[in-house]
């Protein structure tokens, strides 16, 4: 009886190994499938992360490109108007698109979409970045038509006026505030028929006229120079055009813009919006010509005659004028020890000429606080 019972048990255990083997195979297959799926997901996630990074890099390239190639034409865009730029490829599979919006107070919002493209040109990843910008307008301490760290000597038939004056025939100028005629760290001396007027006419022995009043804006603007000219004599500055249709020829180093406006004769309209920043690391002598913008002279400036300039003149050395027909409308700042304005020149303070010279010549820079944003669509 016992032998029969054991035989029956052995017969009941037949096939158990096969069942266990099948169960083990199913478990192993499930584990392999799980590992495979997890690996596939991790690989897909890695690819997505790489593509997202590449799209972000394309967007960053768009941000940097706008700053590196800033055009002063952007400075005059309409307020709160979106200006879209053509898409640009970055390498074989990256692309960015830029939209620039001008806001009030000389500020801008730059939005950039970066795309990573697939082999067929389809978009496989997109990232949006933004940056707040502002025009890099330096802090100019202009409180007079002529500002000198040393004394000012005026002679001949010179007229220096701090009463706000628009350049001849310019339109669209907002009303300004009258300034002093001359402001200096020493005395202002007028001889002969010279006239220094303003509100007040003179500010003398001003102890606040330290070096930084002149060097700080000079160095800021120097870094944005449109024309860098060696020291020397320059004659016959006049606006010129090139190409067809004609456009202002900024490559001509004697083209300093067009300060004239209709109905004056010989107006070169293509250059009326060209306000270059002209920088010389040496001393300059200018004679017979016209221009507008910002003139920076690290050495001495000698104005010989028949020279007309609308905008800002900053001289780190001495300033001398002679002859007739010289006229500066805007502001003159000089840090040298000798300021002698004689002959028959005119120096008129003009808030309009100053504002346009800055607006049409400076470039943009990121806001120091909260300049960068990432947009989420």
State the predicted function of each range.
Residues 101-240, 245, 270-377:
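Short, ordered "entry" segments at domain starts
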Residues 12, 72, 350-351:
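Polar helix-capping/helix-linker motif
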Residues 246-276:
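Eukaryote-specific, low-hydrophobicity, charge-rich regions
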Residues 16-58:
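Aliphatic-rich helix starts adjacent to a transmembrane/signal segment
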Residues 53, 57-111, 232, 248, ...:
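Low-complexity, Gly/Pro-rich coil/beta segments used as flexible assembly/activation regions
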């Amino acid at each position: 009886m016992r032998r029969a019972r054991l035989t029956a048990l052995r017969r009941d255990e037949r096939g158990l190994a096969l069942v266990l083997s099948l169960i083990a195979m199913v478990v192993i297959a499930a584990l392999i499938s799980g590992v495979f799926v997890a690996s596939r997901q991790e690989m897909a996630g890695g690819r997505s992360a790489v593509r997202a990074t590449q799209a972000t890099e394309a967007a960053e390239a768009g941000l940097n490109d706008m700053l590196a190639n800033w055009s002063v034409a952007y400075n005059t865009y309409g307020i709160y108007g979106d200006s879209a730029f053509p898409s640009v490829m970055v390498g074989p599979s990256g692309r960015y698109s830029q939209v620039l919006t001008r806001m009030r107070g000389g500020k801008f919002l730059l939005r950039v979409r970066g795309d990573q493209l697939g082999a067929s040109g389809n978009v496989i990843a997109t990232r949006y970045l933004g940056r707040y910008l502002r025009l890099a307008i330096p802090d100019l301490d202009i409180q007079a038509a002529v500002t000198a760290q040393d004394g000012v000597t005026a002679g001949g038939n010179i007229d220096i006026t701090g009463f706000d004056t628009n350049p001849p025939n310019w339109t669209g100028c907002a009303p300004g505030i009258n300034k002093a005629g001359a402001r200096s760290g020493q005395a202002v001396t007028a001889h002969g028929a010279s006239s220094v007027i303003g509100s007040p006419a003179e500010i003398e022995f001003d102890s606040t006229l330290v070096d930084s009043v002149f060097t700080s804006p000079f160095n800021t603007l120097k870094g944005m120079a449109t024309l860098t000219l060696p020291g020397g004599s320059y004659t016959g500055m006049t606006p010129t055009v090139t190409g067809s249709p004609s456009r202002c020829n900024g490559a001509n180093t004697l083209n300093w813009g067009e300060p004239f406006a209709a109905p004056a004769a010989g107006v070169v309209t293509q250059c009326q919006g060209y306000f270059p920043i002209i920088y010389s690391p040496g001393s300059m002598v200018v004679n017979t010509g016209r221009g507008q913008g910002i003139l920076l002279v690290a050495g001495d400036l000698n104005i010989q005659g028949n020279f007309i300039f609308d905008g800002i003149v900053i001289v780190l050395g001495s300033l001398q004028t002679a002859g007739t027909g010289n006229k500066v409308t805007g502001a003159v700042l000089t840090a040298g020890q000798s300021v002698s304005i004689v002959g028959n020149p005119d120096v008129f303070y003009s808030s309009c000429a100053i504002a346009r010279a800055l607006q049409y010549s400076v470039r943009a820079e990121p806001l120091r606080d909260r300049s960068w944003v990432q947009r989420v669509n």
